[in-house]
Amino acid sequence: MITGLLKKIFGSRNERLIKQYRRKVAQINALEPKFEALSDAELQAKTEEFRQRFAKGETLDALLPEAFAVCREASKRVMKMRHFDVQLIGGMVLHDGKIAEMRTGEGKTLTATLAVYLNAISGQGVHVVTVNDYLAQRDAEWMGRLYNWLGLSVGVNLTTMDHDQKQAAYASDITYGTNNEFGFDYLRDNMVYDAGQRVQRPLNYAIVDEVDSILIDEARTPLIISGQAEDHTDLYRRMNGIPAQLTRQIGEEKSDGTGVEKPGDYYVDEKSHQVYLTESGHEKAEQILLQAGLIGEGESLYAPQNITLMHHLYAALRAHSLFFRDQHYVVQNGEVVIVDEFTGRLMSGRRWSDGLHQAVEAKEGVQIQQENQTLATITFQNYFRMYNKLSGMTGTADTEAYEFQEIYGLETVVIPTNRPPQRKDLQDQIYKTSKERYDAVIRDIRDCYERGQPVLVGTTSIENSELLSNLLNQAKLPHQVLNAKQHEREAEIIAQAGRPKMITIATNMAGRGTDIVLGGNVEKQSGFVMADESLSDAEKASRVKTLQDEWQSLHEQVKAAGGLHIVGTERHESRRIDNQLRGRAGRQGDPGSSRFYLSLDDQLLRIFAGDRVRAIMDRLKMPEGEPIEAGIVTRSIESAQRKVEGRNFDIRKQLLQYDDVSNDQRKELYKLRNEILEAQDVGDLVKNLRESVFTELFRTYVPAETMEEQWDVAGLEKTLREDWGVDQPLVKTLEAAQSIEDEDLLKIVLDAAEAVYEGKVAQVGRESFAGFERSVMLQSLDTHWREHLAALDMLRQGIHLRGYAQKDPKQEYKRESFELFGRLLDTIRNEVTRIVFTVRIQSQEELEQASEQIEEDLSALTNLQYKHDEFSELAEVAAGDAEIHGATPAMAASRSAASAAAAALAGEVPKVGRNDPCPCGSGKKYKQCHGKLV
């Protein structure tokens, strides 16, 4: 109540921000006459003037009013479009590193040009991130005319580009590209073996289009670069037959023993997207595997040697119980292709991880492709947080504003519409069965068709879109289908979806980024005419005029019929996706309407609200075909959606807390890798490694603070000679000396090792040997980093079970992953030193051969695959952790711990004192915990 009163007096935070921005809009508008009076050349010269002023210390904030005014004037001259005042506000929101929520049709693409132009003045690069290559190329070409006219270079970063083209794209002032490609380029840059092979500059500023889709919908799923691992294809085929021999349990057993409607061997938890074997299921599975000869007599499925079988069995069960053809994937040209859950688009080249994709291939009887080993991985959350400044645009961000603020530190500002919205959102209609629901949908579509009103029908899967298409064919209603199978015609179908009597079926929000204009998209048709070289200029002008007149007539006709009508055939688990569908109607003050038709068979209702709604229908004795249309039911559904959204947010937050641990380690390792790449001479780094290894070896035989009688000098001498090629008579030295300190003996060992090293360098020359050392270090880093990623995956898979032992899984994961990281650095340190000391090189030719061999080993990893998985193992762990523990505070000290360990590898002194608390958070002293590792 008090909050509401304060809002009435002072306005909401959003209203206050808009008020501040409107003051700046007034400044920009005041400059308009001045810039209108400039010639083209004078206006174009402003860009260089701004750059010089920025170089002399003037801030971008100070340049904003003039830069926005210049960009607006240039747009009027080049694009024939003038930025509205609300678009100026949107541009300022983007420049301030916030998220601008702008309704569909309000001109987000043009709005972005303001912030892009201003930030490109710095010369440090601006990345405009889109959801697919088509939009990246379209916007780069479309808005590139404006930027080029203003003297800025524009590049587009596409999947198909080669290395040189990518370098040129990133060197441009402005680079358009997809979120996947930017992320993969970052990972690839950290796999190169020559600094000149990197394509990206330091990450300066990014504007993310459809920011909700990229930073929220896809945030649970990491980008992965992988190479082929061991072949298990036969095992997948054999496991594929097992689910059919097991029976599914209906209902989940509760703590009081109730809840099971029909006993079985496994049950499916649709909420957590998991399959679990029951006790009887374990026994039955063991019998089946025993008969198949996959496990031995008396062996348990949980025996260490059978963990792989468990992994494959669960993959097969999930493939059969949770993933369905034409809903989660399609089979195309003998391959299983994933369907994007949120857009309905086909995701060619992407594969589910952890053996799930191979299990689905076995189920469908297509060729099973080999499993992959992860070479590099990063989540979008951690990639985009590396930019100095990040902002985004979308039509639907307000429902996720808390998550944007919590995870990314991004505030959401709702931008006012240029004209008041006219769309009518009608009450949901809920039917008992799917048949009744589809009958009502067909009636609604027929009514619109007869009145000449265009209809956009949203479905949640390809299967549903094709079912509806068949029903419309039976009803003799002409229509077009837009789903993943028609991806190529997407923009064309959407562009004409606003013509009279047009019926368009779209899977989820396929077609985002293209406006549905009432009467059809005349610009698209005019473009075809202008591109026709057989026509004269006069004929082109005449035909374009005819098209525009025809469009104006159709536009008025559609407006009179009520504008675009949106029909939703099912509620999505996220309100935001539903709002995106609704948002296609009523653009820029046009009329429009929307209604959702639901049935009690829908997944969301079945899981969260079905029993309550069914009870209401039974109590009201609703006749067949009669819907419920009441606010209380709609609110009940929205409450269910909020529950799902809250749970998904918890999963994403948990995922980030887990991934932050490996991210800190990744950043430290990549930082070290880049130092090796860029160093003129890696000699100092190798020397630090060398001294660390020999000191550790020395302390194995001569422990600190011990008596001379406790030293094993003979063993040390033998190990140095046989394992390291360092022949130093330590026993004689000790006998000849009356008394010697351990530190003096250590100095003798280090000097002897240094002499052996210098002898090797002298044989081939310092410069050549430094190149060899660089190759050895990079190979060792990359090989063991890959193994470390696999080890982290294994650790993650079972860590949530620690919750049952009253331990915090995240704290345990942080502690154990840091121990693994310490071992990784220890292994690298020892391996690099051992190779450098034991390699036998007599000449320059032999050194070149050794370097070439390393290069061959590195280039063997050419068969790389790039994946952005639909739902990763890491997300499942986070989900499991959320079930057991709930959300707990983030793991705070992992970065300092990883930094300390990496610093030790580089030979730097850790900042943590030996008696200080260990950064891992265990509560122990550093020397008694991770200090041992460094």
UniProtKB/Swiss-Prot annotation:
Q: Which reaction does it catalyse?
A: ATP + H2O + cellular proteinSide 1 = ADP + phosphate + cellular proteinSide 2
Entry GO terms, CC: cell envelope Sec protein transport complex; cytosol; plasma membrane
Presence of the UniProt keyword Protein transport in the record: yes
What subcellular locations does the record give? Cell inner membrane; Cytoplasm
- Choose any GO biological process term that the UniProt entry carries and state it: protein targeting
One of the entry's Gene Ontology molecular-function terms is: protein-exporting ATPase activity
Highest taxon of the lineage: Bacteria
Binding site residues for Zn(2+) = 918, 920, 929-930
Give the note describing cofactor binding and stoichiometry.
Answer: May bind 1 zinc ion per subunit.
Q: Where does ATP bind?
A: 87, 105-109, 515
Please give the InterPro entries that the UniProt record associates with this protein.
Helicase_ATP-bd, Helicase_C-like, P-loop_NTPase, SEC_C_motif, SecA, SecA_CS, SecA_DEAD, SecA_motor_DEAD
Under which EC number(s) is this enzyme classified? 7.4.2.8
The membrane topology of this protein is:
Peripheral membrane protein
Q: Which Pfam families match?
A: P-loop_SecA (PF21090), SEC-C (PF02810), SecA_DEAD (PF07517), SecA_PP_bind (PF01043), SecA_SW (PF07516)
CDD domains in alphabetical order: DEXDc_SecA, SF2_C_secA
Similarity section: Belongs to the SecA family.
Write out the function statement from the record: Part of the Sec protein translocase complex. Interacts with the SecYEG preprotein conducting channel. Has a central role in coupling the hydrolysis of ATP to the transfer of proteins into and across the cell membrane, serving both as a receptor for the preprotein-SecB complex and as an ATP-driven molecular motor driving the stepwise translocation of polypeptide chains across the membrane.
Q: What is this protein called?
A: Protein translocase subunit SecA
Q: Which organism is it from?
A: Ralstonia pickettii (strain 12J)
Encoding gene, per UniProt annotation: secA
